[in-house]
Amino acid sequence: MQVGIVARKGSERAVAVADELRDAVAGAGASVWLDAETADALGEPAAGREVDALADCDLAVAVGGDGTFLFVARNAGDTPIVGVNLGEVGFLNAVPPEAAEEAVVSEVEAFDRGEMNVREAPRLAARTDEWTSVPAANEVVIQGARRGPGAGIDYEVRVDGSRYAGGHADGVLVATPTGSTAYNLSEGGPLVHPAVSGLVVNEMVAEEGMPPIVVDADATVTVAVEGVDEVVVASDGRNVTTLPAPTEVTVERTTPPMRIAGPPSDFFAALEKLS
C-alpha cells in the first residue's frame, strides 16, 4: 500500500503532524511519502514528491484545513482522502490531530483487509464546445471580468433545457452540497446537507433574480452569457479561465467524484463554527 501525505503550506504544526503520521504509517507496514514542500520544511528534500503523484496512491492524507483538503483533491484523482483538521471549520477534514495517527493507521489496516469504507462527494466541471474546466469540489462560478456597478453579465440560466432565470447579475454560481457552505453561502445561497443529492444554482447580486434553487445532482445547468466581451469561469476559486463572449457554459457533475475515507465529519458541529 502507498500513502501520500500533504501538509498545509507554511504551517509548522501541520508539518510536524505530517512527520508523525509518516512514522506511524511506515510502522503499519505501508510505503509512505510527503509532498515536496513538506519534505523541504523537514530538511529532507529527497523524501518529497510532487502532489500529482497522489493519483497513484492508495490513500492520501491532507493535514490542515478544508483548503488543504481541496488542494489534495485536485491532485488525487479517485484516490481516497483522509483529512486531519487543525482547528478550522472542518467540513471535509474530520479528524482532530490528537486522533490522526489512530485514524490513518486504521485506514491502512482496513485497506490491507479489503475493508476500507469510502464515501463519495460530487465534483463539477464547466465546458464549452472548445474547452473543459478543471473539476471543482465546491463550486463553479461564471461571472464578468469585474463585479459591482457597471459590471457583471447579461445571462440566461437553463436547467435541463428549461429556462430558470435571466437578466443582469455579477454572475452565476453552481455549487455541490460540499460547496454550499463556502462561496455559495456568502452569496446568500442555501446550506445543503452532504447526504442530499443535489446542486445549488445561485445568481450573484442579480438585478431581478430568482431565489437560489437546489436541482437534481444529475441536472445539466447551462449559462448563456452576452453583453460583455469576455466571461470568467472559476473552479473552486483557484483555477480561473477567461473565455470570449457571447458564449454558453454548461456545468454538470463529472467523474471521478471526490472520495473521502476515515470518520465522517459532524456537519452540524462544523456549522456551529461558522457563527
Curated annotation (Swiss-Prot):
Keywords: ATP-binding, Cytoplasm, Kinase, NAD, NADP, Nucleotide-binding, Transferase. Its EC number is 2.7.1.23. The active site is at D66 (proton acceptor). One of its GO terms (biological process) is NADP biosynthetic process. The keyword Hydrolase does not apply. It is found in: Cytoplasm. Its cofactor is a divalent metal cation. Its main location: cytoplasm. Transmembrane segments: none annotated. NAD(+) binds at D66, G67, N138, E139, H168, D170, T181, A182, Y183, N184, L185, S186, V205. One of its GO terms (cellular component) is cytoplasm. InterPro entries: ATP-NAD_kinase_N (IPR017438), ATP-NAD_kinase_PpnK-typ_C (IPR017437), NAD/diacylglycerol_kinase_sf (IPR016064), NADK (IPR002504). GO terms for molecular function: ATP binding; metal ion binding; NAD+ kinase activity. Pfam families: NAD_kinase (PF01513), NAD_kinase_C (PF20143). It comes from the Archaea. It catalyses: NAD(+) + ATP = ADP + NADP(+) + H(+). Involved in the regulation of the intracellular balance of NAD and NADP, and is a key enzyme in the biosynthesis of NADP. Catalyzes specifically the phosphorylation on 2'-hydroxyl of the adenosine moiety of NAD to yield NADP. Belongs to the NAD kinase family. This is NAD kinase. It comes from Halorubrum lacusprofundi (strain ATCC 49239 / DSM 5036 / JCM 8891 / ACAM 34). The gene is nadK.
